[in-house]
From Swiss-Prot:
GO terms of biological process kind: cellular response to light stimulus; cellular response to UV-A; detection of light stimulus; G protein-coupled receptor signaling pathway; keratinocyte differentiation; negative regulation of apoptotic process; negative regulation of melanin biosynthetic process; phototransduction
Transmembrane recorded as keyword: yes
Species classification: Eukaryota, Metazoa, Chordata, Craniata, Vertebrata
Tissue-specificity statement: Expressed in tracheal airway smooth muscle (at protein level). Expressed throughout the epidermis and dermis, predominantly in the basal layer on the facial and abdominal skin (at protein level). Expressed in dermal fibroblasts (at protein level). Expressed in melanocytes (at protein level). Expressed in keratinocytes. Expressed in the retina.
Name by which UniProt lists this protein: Opsin-3
Effect listed in the UniProt record for changing residue 299 to G: Abolishes binding of 11-cis retinal and all-trans retinal. No effect on G-alpha (i) protein signaling
Matches recorded under Gene3D superfamilies: Rhodopsin 7-helix transmembrane proteins (1.20.1070.10)
Transmembrane regions: 41-65, 78-102, 118-137, 154-177, 202-229, 256-279, 288-312
Originating species: Homo sapiens
Cytoplasmic side: 66-77, 138-153, 230-255, 313-402
Function: G-protein coupled receptor which selectively activates G proteins via ultraviolet A (UVA) light-mediated activation in the skin. Binds both 11-cis retinal and all-trans retinal. Regulates melanogenesis in melanocytes via inhibition of alpha-MSH-induced MC1R-mediated cAMP signaling, modulation of calcium flux, regulation of CAMK2 phosphorylation, and subsequently phosphorylation of CREB, p38, ERK and MITF in response to blue light. Plays a role in melanocyte survival through regulation of intracellular calcium levels and subsequent BCL2/RAF1 signaling.
Protein topology in the membrane: Multi-pass membrane protein
Modified residues (N6-(retinylidene)lysine): 299
Highest taxon of the lineage: Eukaryota
UniProt record similarity statement: Belongs to the G-protein coupled receptor 1 family. Opsin subfamily.
Amino acid sequence: MYSGNRSGGHGYWDGGGAAGAEGPAPAGTLSPAPLFSPGTYERLALLLGSIGLLGVGNNLLVLVLYYKFQRLRTPTHLLLVNISLSDLLVSLFGVTFTFVSCLRNGWVWDTVGCVWDGFSGSLFGIVSIATLTVLAYERYIRVVHARVINFSWAWRAITYIWLYSLAWAGAPLLGWNRYILDVHGLGCTVDWKSKDANDSSFVLFLFLGCLVVPLGVIAHCYGHILYSIRMLRCVEDLQTIQVIKILKYEKKLAKMCFLMIFTFLVCWMPYIVICFLVVNGHGHLVTPTISIVSYLFAKSNTVYNPVIYVFMIRKFRRSLLQLLCLRLLRCQRPAKDLPAAGSEMQIRPIVMSQKDGDRPKKKVTFNSSSIIFIITSDESLSVDDSDKTNGSKVDVIQVRPL
């Protein structure tokens, strides 16, 4: 329970949630008194309203761009759209409940509202981290194992992501832990404090299944991706203009994915730290002010991903500029200046085999998402002088779009 000066938000929480040990109750008992001053509630409402509007606008824009422009419809972008859909739903449902409560100086919803707020927040948060994990794995099997990813694979992955997230978010609805009012009194979350074996086991497995394992998979995948790119750059026979472009593309894509993961962790880390404190019996250190700040950081993650897409993916940037010209400025670039939908190619595996009198043969596989380069050693095929680099003989380079 919270104790201390409720009007100023000073005091502490014992980690059991504002609802106490009895779980969610009718609205009147969930938040018996305001935890912040009226001015603080107004500022919180302004911040949450801004986060909600930006989250809805930015993520809705990503969905519109994906729908309108054929060039954006790739399996990788479909995974990015899944994150945007999750963030859009967070902005519509999760932020709205807290925003209205700020306007009313406290939680105004009943038990069902509390359960829905906790369930939706958990569901969409797990969807985001699970999609980032699948995105890392997708890059891993394309780059390291040189396998092609199609839409069927992407749709199956998204289906499993939502089923996996529903299982974890729905467990408290079936009696494995529960959703209670958070310490700041403006939203609901899992009961982190409970020492009951049933509740504690859920918290333990939730940390493992939705934090430790995903981060481990992400670290493993990107470690191998960076190693593969580094090995490819060390092979002198592949230092052609085309391959250099591929390396730049992959490096940029790796930076984008890393930035998305880094942003997610930065936004959610304060909340995760608070949960660890509560689980380990240090809930008295968590004040309502600290709790609401961590909540704002977590919800702000819904705003950043679309900005990352636009700034780091040229296809999104071109599509956005074209949409603005067509819809807002009423000026359309000449057709010859606009890239035709589907005209851009995707990079697939590079398989390289070299011949050099005294050196052993090397085989390098590399995968990307824009063009397929296959460098083979078929003696029946001829090769241009431009395909020979550094005194080595490369028999043929085949390039074909996906």
